[in-house]
């Protein structure tokens, strides 16, 4: 099975080698038929401490690294 890749905004970079990424998605409400935004926060492993709060990061599933971390950030794309 392929690993999921999600994109979100880093909301916290306070932990050592850890960032918290907020991923937003849109759904259609089943009764109201209105588009609603939903978000979820993921703890992700950042080996090089490269990401700072406010930056856009892509995360990919990985084997569990700790109690909360089962995602890791992909390296920044070089421009």
UniProtKB/Swiss-Prot annotation:
Gene Ontology BP annotations: translation
GO cellular component entries: cytosolic small ribosomal subunit
Signal peptide: none
GO MF annotation list: rRNA binding; structural constituent of ribosome
Keyword terms, alphabetized: Ribonucleoprotein, Ribosomal protein, RNA-binding, rRNA-binding
TM regions (residue ranges): none
Pfam family, one: Ribosomal_S17
Subunit structure: Part of the 30S ribosomal subunit.
Described purpose of this protein according to its UniProt entry: One of the primary rRNA binding proteins, it binds specifically to the 5'-end of 16S ribosomal RNA.
Similarity annotation: Belongs to the universal ribosomal protein uS17 family.
NCBIfam families: PRK05610.1, uS17_bact
Protein name: Small ribosomal subunit protein uS17
Classification lineage: Bacteria, Pseudomonadati, Pseudomonadota, Alphaproteobacteria, Caulobacterales
């Amino acid at each position: 099975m392929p690993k999921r890749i999600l994109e979100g905004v880093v909301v916290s970079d306070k932990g050592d080698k850890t960032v918290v990424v907020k991923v937003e998605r849109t759904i259609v409400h089943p009764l109201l038929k209105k588009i609603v935004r939903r978000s979820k926060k993921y703890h992700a492993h950042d080996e090089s401490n490269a990401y700072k709060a406010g930056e856009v990061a892509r995360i990919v599933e990985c084997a569990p690294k700790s109690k909360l971390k089962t995602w890791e950030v992909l390296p920044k794309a070089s421009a």
